[in-house]
């Protein structure tokens, strides 16, 4: 149908109770123009139309957008947030969405839906009144305005991400907060009512000063792999990303934070190279952990004498078939993994042996040494022909993909 026929059909369906926005939107596919409202006003002028209200399609929702934008500013101001970008969305009455779709169906046309226009028009007002741009990919704030009855505003504060590297300089600290096995975090006599298996963790030592500086509600720690509780993380440290949820401050002074974390950690943990990051980096860090090589220093106890000729045989360690270790089988899938030892060197230390092992990520080093009752093959123990045990272990380097 031509413009006149479409116009007549619209006026008949709505009994002329339609606003310029909802009228102009139905001609966006056949008429150029700077916007639906102006397009509708041109149609009114050109065809001498007399439109009545309230609009049968939208219920005059467009007349409420200025008020809605003011309500958004009030809400955001009350929250006292730091932000530099927003994304605005709305909730409309179901009958408005249904009528809008039904009219287009009866006309046999495919044009922009009412919700998209309302979002755009309100978004323009909000970004203007807040003096910040819209960001459709990674906004600081996601603002949802409920226009179903009384105007209600909900503000979602998106997280910030800070990455860096940490060194764990003492043993006996887990990477992340470890809930008590008995009470599962509720607090009991076993955990001295702390809800934790250990007094602190790398995660807590790093996150607590950051939460204070940002006013965040919670945090989540993402490491590039993890070391055991009794293992130190030395060298240049392990990469991590700290996710801070609902921060009031999005750009804290990272140099000052670095100093504060290190001061409060009292030599247990150190951080370096703090910088702002992104959600994608969190995913990359997790996915790359398996591909990174690790360098370890292991002090090994041997239950028997071995010659230097025996020790040279350790250089043959290459492809390792490792079944899920017994010590983690209660929380890891029972399967066989293949990992490679990339380099190994040895040095005698009195009645112990020092091994420097470079290996692919995901290889369990303690079990590489002991053999784990035959679940890891080959192993240091099987090659030397004597029982071997890892007395202490340090991670010296978390490198780039091997």
UniProtKB/Swiss-Prot annotation:
One Gene Ontology molecular-function label: tRNA binding
Active site: 228
Annotated keywords: Isomerase, RNA-binding, tRNA processing
Enzyme's top EC category: isomerase
Similarity comment: Belongs to the pseudouridine synthase Pus10 family.
Organism encoding this protein: Methanothermobacter marburgensis (strain ATCC BAA-927 / DSM 2133 / JCM 14651 / NBRC 100331 / OCM 82 / Marburg)
Name of protein: tRNA pseudouridine synthase Pus10
EC number: 5.4.99.25
UniProt cross-references to InterPro entries, sorted A to Z: PsdUridine_synth_cat_dom_sf (IPR020103), Pus10 (IPR005912), Pus10-like (IPR039894), Pus10-like_C (IPR048741), Pus10_THUMP_arc (IPR055174), THUMP_dom (IPR004114)
Protein encoded by which gene: pus10
Pfam families named among the record's database cross-references: Pus10_C (PF21238), Pus10_THUMP_arc (PF22023)
Keyword tRNA processing in annotation: yes
